[in-house]
Amino acid sequence: MLGSVLTRRSSSGSDNRVFVYEVEGLRQNEQTDNNRYQIRNSSTIEIQVPYSRMNEEDRRITRLGGRIVNIRPAGENPTEDASEN
């Protein structure tokens, strides 16, 4: 019984959270050709990432030569951050 409690996935709010990664420096190559979006070397792109996949996505972006410049919750307006500074 204790084992089943320990292996059961948590149904906390973190399972439903989504974040937006702002990424720069990704290069278009054979691996990125499989993405649903085009990569432009001169600009940043935004990628929606579920909380449960953040670590994997961080590694993938680094492996592809990108750099994460900002992470924010998906529902947050990006202009709100700029007005606070």
UniProtKB/Swiss-Prot annotation:
Disulfide bonds: none annotated. It is found in: Cellular thylakoid membrane. It is a peripheral membrane protein. GO terms for cellular component: phycobilisome; plasma membrane-derived thylakoid membrane. It comes from the Bacteria. Keywords: Antenna complex, Membrane, Photosynthesis, Phycobilisome, Thylakoid. Pfam families: CpcD. Residues 16-74 form the CpcD-like domain. GO terms for biological process: photosynthesis. The keyword Transport does not apply. Its main location: membrane. PROSITE patterns: CPCD_LIKE. InterPro entries: CpcD-like_dom (IPR008213). Rod linker protein, associated with phycocyanin. Linker polypeptides determine the state of aggregation and the location of the disk-shaped phycobiliprotein units within the phycobilisome and modulate their spectroscopic properties in order to mediate a directed and optimal energy transfer. Belongs to the phycobilisome linker protein family. This is Phycobilisome 9.7 kDa linker polypeptide, phycocyanin-associated, rod.
